[in-house]
Amino acid sequence: MMDVLMYLFETYIHSDIELTVDQEKLEDELLKAGFHQEAIYKALDWLEDLAHLQETDSHEHIAKSTSTAMRIYTQQEIDGIDTVCRGFLLFLEQIKVLTCETREMVIEQVMTLETEDLSLDDLKWVILMVLFNVPGQESAYTQMEELLYTSDTGMTH
């Protein structure tokens, strides 16, 4: 599913091509590109969920949290997001690329990926997609885009 998401993002969204194709044509194009039907459906559902996240007040309690609040991960999140990825999320919060609200959107979207081995590169793509879909996050998106295309994130181990 991650491959389909990256393909869609690079082909349509990131390249500023207007996405006016209907879902059936899009599915046909993705099938012709070699993606499996199940992965296509999951990716399209994932994108719908992402769009829905910004329309709801599901993170209203997060918007009220202070900048000194510390995120405690559930066991399921710990199992799905390794230490390196969690550290990267914290790093992005510290340099103000992510807010508490966008961090929660990223975590929510990562947990729906149904992947056992989320790589740091996959996480970066998810973050980029989330920031692209949240109004007012253009600067954070640009910073994240730079981090995605450079291998050194400035993190120390």
Swiss-Prot record:
| Highest taxon listed in the record's lineage | Bacteria
Q: Which Pfam families match?
A: DUF494 (PF04361)
Family that this chain belongs to: Belongs to the Smg family.
Instruction: Name the chain's protein.
Output: Protein Smg homolog
